[in-house]
Every structure is written in structure tokens, then in C-alpha cells.
Amino acid sequence: VSFGIVSPDGREGMLQNAAEFAEAGIPFIFDPGQAMPLFNGEELRHFIELTDYVTVNDYESNLLQERTGWSEADIVKRVKAYITTRGPHGSQIHTPEKTYDIPPAHERRVTDPTGCGDAFRAGLIYGIEKGYDWLTIGRMGNLMGALKVEHPGTQNQRFDFDEFNEQFKQQFGYAL
């Protein structure tokens, strides 16, 4: 295992997975999502101290800051990247060095938003694993979400890398 994600699951499972990733030296994304209310501020701060990346939406970002008592800057200085999705407004990636405003990818039609966040994170993981720059990683995540929203259900979209790359080039003006 070279990369992981701790996403909404049972409370004990999330705590255990984060501890095991950290102990094994495996970089991982902490994605608290709808499980955030299961944890107190101290536990959320501990997750942030263990992880390399935090990903949340706008609402979750505010809640995470409120529950931890940490500002966005406090979180950013503890991780490689603090990633916030902003729905139709794209996303932001905050690193200790710089904040990247990532433009949205435009879908052809909106069919079902269920699973868009998961698709976004799949793009992030792929981009991080392949060593792309943050602007490209964010664009990959945004495009994955846009492609997902065009299809019903959570896993009914299918495309290969060449098709994805063509969409990426059309959306952002350069190929991967």
C-alpha cells in the first residue's frame, strides 16, 4: 500500500486506520465528511497531526475549524495540503507555500451529484500518486467530479485515460 484515505466509516475504524497509516509511514488523506460529528476537537486535531492531506467541502471546513479551534492557517501549517471543494465554484488547495484557486470543470449535463466528492478525491489521489503539480491535481479532481455528475448512481461512469485526457485538454487547455 503506497497511499491511503481515511473517509467516513465507523468511529473506531477511522481512528485505527489513521493510526495504522501513520505508523506504517503511508501518506493518506483525512476526509472526515459526515463522520465529523463522531469526533471531538482533540481527536480531529490528532487526525490532522497524523495525516498529510485534509479534504473537506466549504461547510465541513468551517465545522472542522470550529471543532478543532484551529484556523485554516493553523491546519495548513500541519499538512502538505488542505483541500476544500466549493461546488460549482471549483476548489482550493492550500499548501504551506501557496493557495491555489482551482477553476471548476464544466459538466455537459447534471444528472446526479451523488458520489461527486468521491470522484473528486479519486482525481486527487491519482494526481498526487503520479506527481502532478497542485493546479493540475485540483483540475483532475474537479473534472472527475464533473464527469461523475453527468451519470446516475455513484459508479456508473466509464472512461479510459485517453478519454479523460481529451476532456481535460478541452476544459483546461493542456493535456496531461
Where are these regions (language model features)?
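Conserved post-catalytic alpha-helical subdomain immediately downstream of the catalytic base
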Residues: 78-81, 105-175
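Ribokinase/PfkB-type carbohydrate-kinase core domain
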Residues: 1-101, 132, 163, 169-176
